[in-house]
Amino acid sequence: MVSFILQTEKLCKTFSNGGVMQHVIKNLDLEVEEGDFTVIMGSSGSGKSTLLYALSGMDKPSMGKVIFDGTEIQNKSNDELATFRRGNCGFVFQSIYLLENQTVLDNVLTGALIVQKNSPELVKKAKELLEKTGIKETSWNKYPNQLSGGEAQRVGIVRAIINNPRILFADEPTGQLNSAAGNDVLDIFTEIHKNGQSIVMVTHDLKTAIRGNRVLYLRDGGIVGDYRMPRFGEDDIKERKNKLTEFLGDMGW
């Protein structure tokens, strides 16, 4: 039986632009299966990031429902939403938000202590995750301004996953990285997905989108394309790229 971790019903989001209401998301229905790596694509202004923020509870919809594991979240108070996010969601953004006055290890632990109590086990887990994502012990006492962009983004990912979130949201996580650093970060997302993590990611980049097993294409605030693939690594990479490119071409990408 299919298990949906996230659903929307008639989701709408509007903004006032010079006194004129702009409909960014329009009556959008969506079901996200638990364990899927869902990629959201579309042209600039199509509503990608707006949808991501509504799905994650970081922004409330104007109308409609957002349902997380059977529970509606759109009418929760800001405090209730903050509590919900801490226990269920991890976030990785294009702009890397690390606390400049804290070391790498302390940045990760600060994120963890929002949910968990400090303990030797927690510190051990933080160090293990940093190692797994390529941040060696020699960097644990460095400060953010001593890291490369790729290193800082990897620290951000560790901070996002240390609390074992049910779902991980990412908004253009490789957008400010060079190609090599971007590939390293994508390898981490692929490994996380192989371990059963649900991921919803916004991107405009083909080499990022190819890592997912589902690609949604947005236009004018609605889903106009829904393409599914095997999990990354389970099919021929060249054929995978060609088929996804063909789908995106049909969408006008």
Can you say where each PLM-predicted feature lies in the sequence?
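Helix-to-loop junction immediately C-terminal to a conserved catalytic motif
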Residues: 56
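Conserved ABC ATPase signature
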Residues: 143-147, 151-153
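Conserved catalytic motifs of ABC-family nucleotide-binding domains
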Residues: 164
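Catalytic Walker B motif of ABC-type/P-loop ATPase nucleotide-binding domains
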Residues: 168-171
